Amino acid sequence: YFAFVGSFTPYWSLYLKSLGFAAFQIAVLMSLFQVARIFAPSLWGWLADHLGRRVPIIQWLAGLSLVSYIGVFLSVSYAWLFAVMLLLSFFWSASLPLIETVTLGHLGDRFDRYGHIRMWGSIGFILAVIGLGYLLDIYNIRLLLWAVLGMMVAVFIFSYHIPEPQIVPHHTDSGSIWAIMKQKEVLALLAACFMMSAAHGVYYTFYSIYLVDHGYSKAHVGWLWALGVIAEILIFLWMPKLTKLFGLKRILVISLFIAFIRFNLIGWAVDWWWVVIFAQVLHAATFGSYHASAVALTHQYFKGRHQSKGQGLYTSVSYGMGGTFGGLVSGYAWEAFGSSWTFAFSGLFGLLGCLLFVWLMPKKAKL
């Protein structure tokens, strides 16, 4: 799965640029995955909780994603790619929240060990992003299409080897998910997650283009993406200790503030390679510790039969709504204000998320 992400996220925008699409068109196409995340994870999560089985749905989603993706080989028109990517994203974006639920279901009370499982996804990302970086410097960008196809075939095969966890009943099972969502702690978490994903909109849409435009080779681009994920792996390994030292909520607040610093560094210091490297190391916080703490907090708030819906809601609000908003804003800002200002604006979303989380969190809820 994350080898696919390591192939698609850094390089797909370069493929779209090679087809002659404008910056805003690229932003729209890249945002389709976030658009689908607004409703698809919650829909499939509801179905999984209703049926009481997650793994068969994961298998169906993997198969339907594979069939949808084949459409990219048939035409390169903007309207066709729009339709294909929207259909693909509807199936693909729903699988990760279900996998998160399955993983946390197997871990039980040992949720602080989540990072040790998730780091294997990061390793897959690194191998894909570095390998393709070198290959795309040598071969035509269309090689990317076949590499992504290989990743999706592998996901489909491995989905049939995932064990189904036992769903543990909880006293909140009889309650409504709306009652959980209206809790101030949950609202604070969702607001913060929306802002963090909005901050990353420009990063996931234009970062590779931004680096190439400033003279970095595709191999260098691959290594920079990989460096961020290596830092992410290290933070995943340290999360059990960090959680005991600081708690999940403090980790989330710190991660949001670091996003403000990171995207300003990328925006204003792209020509200083050592600053770019340092900014990528900060991915450990802006994704690694942020995501691990957000997933764990979601798992704490949504129990029993609400677990899949909870993870789906987290994905919908953050990567769906927040990612779509951030991606579309970045597409407009890129053409209106330029690349550096776009990254600086994105940093403000991280700062706003930090302030919102602290402001909305109930006084009795210890940070």
Label each region the model flagged:
Residues Y1-Q34, V186-A192, S197-L224:
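Helix-loop boundary and gating motifs at the non-cytosolic
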Residues L16-K17, L47-A48, M119, Y134-Y139, ...:
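Interfacial helix-cap and linker-helix signal at transmembrane-aqueous boundaries
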Residues F39-R53, L136-D137, L234-L248, W334-E335:
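Helix-to-loop junctions at the C-terminal end of transmembrane segments
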Residues P56-I70, R250-L265:
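Structural signature of the two symmetry-related core transmembrane helices
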Residues F73-M85, G267-A279:
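Helix-loop junctions at membrane interfaces in 12-TM secondary transporters
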Residues L86-W120:
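Cytoplasmic helix-loop-helix junction between adjacent transmembrane helices
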Residues L143-Y160, T342-W359:
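Symmetry-related core transmembrane helices of the 12-TM Major Facilitator Superfamily/SLC fold
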Residues S159-C193:
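Juxtamembrane intracellular "pre-TM" segments in multi-pass secondary transporters
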